[in-house]
Swiss-Prot record:
It catalyses: L-arginyl-[protein] + 2 S-adenosyl-L-methionine = N(omega),N(omega)'-dimethyl-L-arginyl-[protein] + 2 S-adenosyl-L-homocysteine + 2 H(+). One of its GO terms (cellular component) is mitochondrion. This is Protein arginine methyltransferase NDUFAF7 homolog, mitochondrial. One of its GO terms (biological process) is methylation.
């Protein structure tokens, strides 16, 4: 989206959003109507929009988008929000990620300073647990870098990770700088491009699934893109393009076109951009990455775009800006974009990944120090959720520079992936 288009979008949304500019803590029950009115008016004036544009607007539009709401009291994560993430369930998840990061870092042979980058940190629960795990190894060379587009969430993350709050910086690549409770330098950025050069470890949990997707449907021998349009009554609805367009011709790979069993497909070019940015970094300056998300290896043959409100699946078009929009990550598609430049492991089921890291052993240790039976039961329940349905739906996907390929092969793969050959060999 060009800067000019972004400015037009922001100015238009401000026009519709005047009524919700209230003092902090005030949450207008009508705030989503402003976004819906904007979308309806936009479609009436300029025509149908892609699912990707609809998703991006609903998620990140200033003031009225899901993560761009004015109110800092918006409940998104956890039991009182719309969805719960693995780090919110139990400290076990973040601790295992922290152990994995340190273990793989040690096996690269890297010495000296390094950067730990998290994409889309949410309320910073994952980073909190990762740093607690790293502290046990007495690592003094790490600095933390968080990529976050929501100012309200940046405030939440700083409150969680730091003792004192700070002010936004001007004329610096980072937008905020502070120290964590354990004295680690921490920085916030709006874009991966602003992170300093250097050896970097990237982590992300439920980040890629929130990025915009394009949806396609096959009719006969032709592929059509799915758009968001209006019914005769002025309600939002889905429709198919009349024929092939620039997106069907430019995004759908020949492997999908040649698959006679395929009638639907979806992809996220924005996710592809993020993954390529990660690969550019780790192949140039050293490092590796671990992304955990809803996803599949490319074999899914149905659309996955959906919305969640209060932990229940709802209509994706009914309340734009009020529900969490998500789509399964096609790790197979992403792997094809970078397989010539990096060594890829996964996607592995989350429960397999965590089991190989020894999460059950860590569970037993934590149960021994629980205060009472109720705390033990809560821990066991969280563990079962992490390793049960969530453990099947979520996948772990790791990227390493090809310079580490021989070492990784000698080890039988990185921790958590020893039971599965790397993607580049499939």
């Amino acid at each position: 989206m060009s800067l000019r288009v972004q400015n037009i979008l922001i100015n238009s949304l401000r026009q519709y959003s005047k009524q919700i500019l209230k003092p902090p803590g005030y949450a207008s029950p009508e705030k989503t109507n402003h976004l819906k009115k904007f979308l309806v008016d936009k479609i009436r004036v300029s025509g149908p929009i892609t699912v990707a544009e609809y998703m991006k607007t609903c998620v990140s539009a200033p003031l009225v988008g899901y993560y761009g709401q004015f109110s800092k009291d918006q409940k998104v994560f956890g039991a009182k929000g719309d969805f719960i993430t693995s780090p919110e369930l139990t400290q076990l998840f973040g601790e295992m990620i922290g152990v994995w990061v340190f273990h793989e870092l040690a096996n690269t042979g890297h010495k000296g300073s390094w950067q730990l980058v998290e994409l889309g940190p949410g309320r910073a629960q994952l980073m909190n647990d990762v740093l607690n795990a790293l502290a046990k190894f007495n690592d003094k060379d790490v600095s933390v870098h968080l990529v976050e587009t929501s100012d309200a969430l940046i405030d939440e993350q700083e409150k969680s990770l730091c003792i004192y709050t700070s002010k936004n910086s001007i004329d610096t690549p980072f937008i905020r700088k502070n120290k964590t409770r354990t004295g680690v330098n921490i920085y916030w950025y709006k874009s991966i491009d602003d992170i300093p050069d250097g050896f970097t470890v990237f982590i992300g949990n439920e980040f890629l699934d929130a990025l915009p997707i394009h949806q396609f449907h096959k009719s006969g021998d032709s592929w059509n893109e799915v758009y968001v349009n209006l019914t005769k009554d002025g309600d939002l609805c889905f429709m198919k393009s009349k024929g092939e367009n620039l997106h069907t011709k430019g995004l759908i790979p020949s492997a999908i076109r040649d698959d006679s069993s395929r009638v639907t497909w979806e992809c996220s070019p924005e996710s592809g951009t993020v993954v390529n940015q990660i690969v550019d970094r780790i192949t140039t300056f050293g490092g590796f990455s671990l992304l955990v998300d809803y996803g599949h290896d490319g074999s899914r043959n149905t659309h996955s775009f959906r919305a969640y409100k209060n932990h229940k699946q709802v209509d994706t078009l009914e309340n734009p800006g009020l529900a969490d929009l998500t789509a399964d990550v096609d790790f197979g598609y992403l792997s094809t974009l970078v397989k010539d430049r990096v060594v890829i492991y996964g996607p592995n089921e989350q429960r397999e990944f965590l089991a190989q890291l020894g999460i059950e052993h860590r569970l037993r240790r934590l149960l021994q120090v629980c205060k009472d039976r109720k705390q033990q039961e809560q821990l066991i329940e969280s563990y079962n959720m992490l390793m049960g349905d969530m453990g099947l739906k979520f996948k772990a996907w790791a990227l390493f520079p090809k310079t580490l390929e021989f070492i990784l092969e000698q080890r039988g793969g990185p921790a958590g992936f020893s039971a599965k050959k790397k993607t580049t060999e499939n």
